[in-house]
Amino acid sequence: LIDADNIEYESANKTTIFTPNFEVPEVVRGESNSTYSDIYAFGILSYLAITIAHPFKGIGLEEAGWDSEETNKKEQWELPWIEDSNDDSNRSNNGLKGPLTITQDLYKLFRKLFENGKEDKYKRPTLPTWIEFLEKAASSTILCHGCGMSYYEELFPNCPYCKKAKPTRLIVESYYYKNEQKQQKRWKFVKEINEDIKSIELPSYIFKTFNILETDDIFLEIKFINKSRVELSFNKNDEEVYFESQTAMRSLKKGLSLNKLENGISIITKSDIATFVEIKIEK
């Protein structure tokens, strides 16, 4: 997802080469490229992939076309991005923007990148930050069984594309835990449940600090044994896990009724941070 033409660190590169539609300001101007250039190109591609709209292809580009009489016509990369908070001269109605595709946290990153970070590369959000918030956005979506589109579970009462009712789903909410009390919410994970489902795997970042090198690691697998029983299977190392007890679990497995999971359970995990995780099935 990163423009290979920009892959450098802080070393100088005097050759100006860039991919059309993925221009990075400092690279086009002939300045040295760097990891900050990669971040800018990554942001363009991310916005395009999420919304199906290019962040700099708006009415400003259309109004300054090939037959324009302007002598100081701006290039695409010089225009404000299409959702600029201070300049709507390049706005666009194309694509799937807004709550359908972009969370508020992601909007903050895009604005920081394309507004504050356009000319000052040191203000661009780091790649680990992008990965974390893209993962947060993806993990809070559900797949519609009617049209096959994904949408943010907590924002819509039913599918915004085909209006089909929400499927039965597992909802997992993770909070910071301090002084025996749950604190600020840190993560939400949602997964649709169908009749044929065998198990649902919950990533480590729900229970522990987010680590970009461990995004695929599984901490808890919920196995649907039959129509009335489930099994919790933990993949823990040195973490302390508390479930319905003030004593840390010794066994890596715990069986319980499906009805109990429907009513909701909570798990406390203590590692580099302490988390309070609520898990339940909603219909």
What are these regions (language model features)?
Residues T35-S37, S46-Y107:
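Conserved C-lobe activation region of Hanks-type protein kinase-like domains
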Residues I2-E8:
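Activation of the activation-loop gatekeeper triad in protein kinase-fold domains
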Residues E10-N33:
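Conserved activation segment of eukaryotic-like protein kinases, specifically the C-terminal portion
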